[in-house]
């Protein structure tokens, strides 16, 4: 459901930009892949835009696996490379525990053993916001639209639009998450990056949706 809402919001932003003639003919959205969500034109060049439904949206939930005593990623991609660069694998491997999920025959795992895995694995770690800027900078993406908060720049305002920087604290959450309540072994280990809700960013004065009196960003 969370993905569907986020996808619908991205489509809404895409449609708003299209209605203003700011989407090139034949362009499509990035969707759930690693591509940047939307491209918008400015002074005859295209620029990347990340789109998030709200502050609750995550910046990439990734599943982990334990193999021969070492934690790694189930699938390697740009986001897992980013997570590795900020020390996620080091943090998890430093926990130095043997997960029941990978060391006991799956049909023999008890609820108590699942709970032990959750207690040993789960954690929250603050991540430097500059790491997020660098991640998007590496994708040549310098702007972000967040539902209810507006349009910001990330690492820098490369178009000199006068935008505010998306500046807040980020938390990396490690979860041993239930996939299905039955059988018991249906749970996995995940890393996910989200905004720390205790220190929310100040709302932008620009907003593609133009809500609450915010102005459309000067990209036309």
Residue ranges with predicted function:
Residues 1, 11, 19, 25, ...:
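Catalytic cores of nucleic-acid endonucleases
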Residues 6-10:
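Nuclease catalytic cores
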Residues 24-34, 41-43:
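Active-site metal-binding core of divalent-cation-utilizing nuclease and nuclease-like domains
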Residues 36-38, 142:
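Residue-level detector of beta-strand structural context in well-folded domains
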Residues 38-40, 47-53:
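Conserved catalytic cores of phosphodiester-cleaving nucleases, focusing on short active-site segments
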Residues 205-220:
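Charge-dense, extended regions
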């Amino acid at each position: 459901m969370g993905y569907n809402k986020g996808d619908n919001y991205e489509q809404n932003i895409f449609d708003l930009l299209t209605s203003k003639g700011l989407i090139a003919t034949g362009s499509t959205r990035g969707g759930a892949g690693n591509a940047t969500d939307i491209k918008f034109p400015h002074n005859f060049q295209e620029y990347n835009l990340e789109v998030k439904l709200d502050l609750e949206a995550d910046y990439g939930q990734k599943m982990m696996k334990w193999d021969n005593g070492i934690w790694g990623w189930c699938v390697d991609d740009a986001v897992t490379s980013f997570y590795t660069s900020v020390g996620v694998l080091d943090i998890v491997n430093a926990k130095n525990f043997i997960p029941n999920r990978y060391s006991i025959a799956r049909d023999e795992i008890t609820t108590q053993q699942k709970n032990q895995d959750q207690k040993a694995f789960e954690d929250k770690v603050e991540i430097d916001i500059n790491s997020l800027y660098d991640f998007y900078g590496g994708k040549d993406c310098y702007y972000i639209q967040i539902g209810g908060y507006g349009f910001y720049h990330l690492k820098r305002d490369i178009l000199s639009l006068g935008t505010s920087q998306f500046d807040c604290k980020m938390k990396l959450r490690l979860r041993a998450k239930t996939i299905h309540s039955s059988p018991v072994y249906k749970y996995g280990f995940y890393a996910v990056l989200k905004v720390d809700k205790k220190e929310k960013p100040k709302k932008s004065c620009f907003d593609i949706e133009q809500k609450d009196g915010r102005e459309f960003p000067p990209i036309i």
